[in-house]
Amino acid sequence: MDTVERTDLVARFTEEVIERDEIETLFEEQDEPTAYIGYAPTGEMHIGHFTTMRKLADFIDAGLDVTVLVADLHAHLDDAKSPFELLEARSEYYERAIEGMIAAAGADPDGISFIRGTDFQLDEPYTLDLYRLLADTTLSRAQRAGSEVVRQSENPSLGSLVYTLMQALDVAALDADIAYGGIDQRGIYMLAREQLPDHGYDKPACVFAPLLSGLSGGKMSASEAGSKINLTDDGEAIDEKIGGAYCPAGETEENGVLEYLEYLVFPVFDQRDTSFVVERPEKYGGDLEYGTYDELEADFVSGELHPADLKPAAAAAIDEVVAPVRELLLEDPELLASAYPERYE
């Protein structure tokens, strides 16, 4: 692949890229630029994480050196979402789940490297750099940067503010040319682009994934079980959630069913050279087969494809994609119980 093709692969199925020309320059100057994504091991991973993880398959194919940070300290700093005693089990669970998602997306999990926050964030050089960032950042700037990521209140904990600066610093500490994350991470990585050059580091290029709508419409909520599909949900649960999902005929706005198809199912099926089939009785026009998401959306908007026909096909396809990850996680019930005792014990 040439530089343009590699950049196209990095940029596809994303919400925003800052800046495309910077990524092209990286490919022109380096054989294997570096990229990283960080996840704080808090709640169970779900299909929203899967769409973000699937993108790493594109990064690997484009020839990026990819690191996944399991940010264990961050998981406690953000309003103690993960108690200290659960950090080890949840970190192991996240690594296992991410490996499963990468494999299910058609890439080799050996193409990514894992690192935990405690592997480097307690070292003296990192700590000194963090103190320098703390000295240079106002309270309001830190709050603004992390407003979409950490819990906010009128009287925030210091942990939530340190969290934001640590995430910005992680880019430099991991020597990442590209910072990747959901679009909710934008504020933090703009802070990194703004401040890291003042401390002797290069500013990172940034790639942002879209945040999916919940199945009930609006933003996906980690606390609302029916708004998302967990990686351990079985086929029956997936069918039930998709069957009850917000998916009004002809409407694409805040339609989680369509978004799951666009950002997860079709990219995975494309990797497998598989088409998406909607089964319909002959009296309603017979089966429909789609090679691209755009074709499906056009039929949905025009009314050719009805939600009653789309939903069963979507549920079956999502189950097919999630199944190998589900099987991998359920093979180790002790890990699930250790990481999330309130659900699996």
Curated annotation (Swiss-Prot):
Motif ('HIGH' region): 41-49
Protein function: Catalyzes the attachment of tyrosine to tRNA(Tyr) in a two-step reaction: tyrosine is first activated by ATP to form Tyr-AMP and then transferred to the acceptor end of tRNA(Tyr).
The keyword Cell inner membrane is annotated on this UniProt entry: no
InterPro entries according to UniProt: aa-tRNA-synth_I_CS, aa-tRNA-synth_Ic, Rossmann-like_a/b/a_fold, Tyr-tRNA-ligase, Tyr-tRNA-ligase_3, Tyr-tRNA-ligase_arc/euk-type, Tyr-tRNA_synthase
Subunit structure: Homodimer.
Organism placement in taxonomy: Archaea, Methanobacteriati, Methanobacteriota, Stenosarchaea group, Halobacteria
Predominant localisation class: cytoplasm
Subcellular locations according to the entry: Cytoplasm
Protein name (database record): Tyrosine--tRNA ligase
Gene it is expressed from: tyrS
Swiss-Prot/TrEMBL GO biological process terms: tyrosyl-tRNA aminoacylation
Reactions that this protein is recorded to catalyse: tRNA(Tyr) + L-tyrosine + ATP = L-tyrosyl-tRNA(Tyr) + AMP + diphosphate + H(+)
Source organism: Natronomonas pharaonis (strain ATCC 35678 / DSM 2160 / CIP 103997 / JCM 8858 / NBRC 14720 / NCIMB 2260 / Gabara)
